[in-house]
Amino acid sequence: MRLAVLVPVVVCSLALVGTAGASQLIARNASNISLQVNSNGKALITYRAGRRVTHLIAWGAINARPRPASPSGPRQVKLKLDYSGGWGPWRKLIWKHFKNACQPYDGPELAWFVTACRAPNGSYWALQSWQTALPDLGFVPWMKKQRTWWLHLSHWSGPLPQLEVYQDWVYSGRFQRIFGRYTYKGRGVRGFGTTHFGAPTDSYGRLVFVDTHNSVYGAGWMRENSFVSSGPPGLFCYGFYPFDPLVNGYAHPPGTTHRKRGPGTGDMYRLTATGPGVTPDVSWQGPGLHPYDPNNPSDVEHEHEMNAKLTEIKAGWHKCHAG
C-alpha cells in the first residue's frame, strides 16, 4: 500500500537499541540460499555463511497470534529451528533425504525477496534479507555486525500485515513527519512495553525502520531511525528533527560529539516493518515532501486533510498529536 499524504502529526520517536524477533531471523550474511518444504510441514533451508554450509530445519508455527489482554497470556508464535539438519530432534540427518513438495511461489509481492514457495497445504514459506542492524542517524557502519544482511524466514497463509503511511509537516512547517498505522488482520500490531530507549520488551512488539534517501547524511539510502507501533490502532509517528547522537541511546562511532545530526529529510523514504509472529516483513517507499509554504493553498489543504486522517487513525489513542 503506497500513500503519500500530508498531515500535522506529533513526533513520538525514540532511539532504539536492539531489534525484536519477527518473521524470524535465522542467519546473517547468508549466500547460496535454497528453500524446500515437505508434505509434513517442515522447511529445509540450505545456505552458506562464511565457510560453513548449514542445513536448517524449521517447523511448528504459522501466521501470528493477536496480542492477548495481558502480558501473562501466551507468547507470540515462533518457529522451531534445528541447525543440525535433523540430528538434534530426530537423531537422523533428514536433510539428506528431504522430499521437497513445495510449488513455485504465486503469493503476494514481498519486499527484500530472496526466495519463496507454496507448500502442499496452500500456505507460503519465504526468505527475505535486508540490513536490519544499520546504525541510526545516518552513521556509516563502523562495526562489521552493523553491515550484516539478516536472513528472515516466514510462514503464513491469508493476508499480509499492512503498513499504511502518510506524511505531513509539523512546527509550522519547519519539519517533515511520517505517520500511519501497522495492522495485521485489522488489528494494530503492538506489544506491551518498551525499554527506556524504545526497544520492544516482549514477543508482540515490532519495530518499524525508516531509511532516508539523498539526505544530509549523504547520497543513497541511510538508516534514519526505528520505532514501535503502539496502541489499538498500531499507530506510529516520526518527525525528522535534528538529534543529538549522544542522547537517548543511539549507537555512535568513537569520537562522536554532541553536535546534532540531521534533520534526515530526503527525496525518498522507505519504511520496513518486521512481521508479527512469523509473517513476512513488509515495506513502503515513497517520495518525501517539499518545503512547506503557508501561502500555498494546496499545502494548507493537505495539512487539514492529514489532521483529519490522523484523528481518524488514532481513534482516541493518546499518542501522536496534530501539530
Mark where each language-model region is.
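N-terminal signal peptide c-region/cleavage motif recognized by signal peptidases
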Residues: 17-19
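Bacterial N-terminal signal peptides
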Residues: 4-15
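Extracellular, repeat-based ectodomains that mediate carbohydrate processing or recognition
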Residues: 21-323
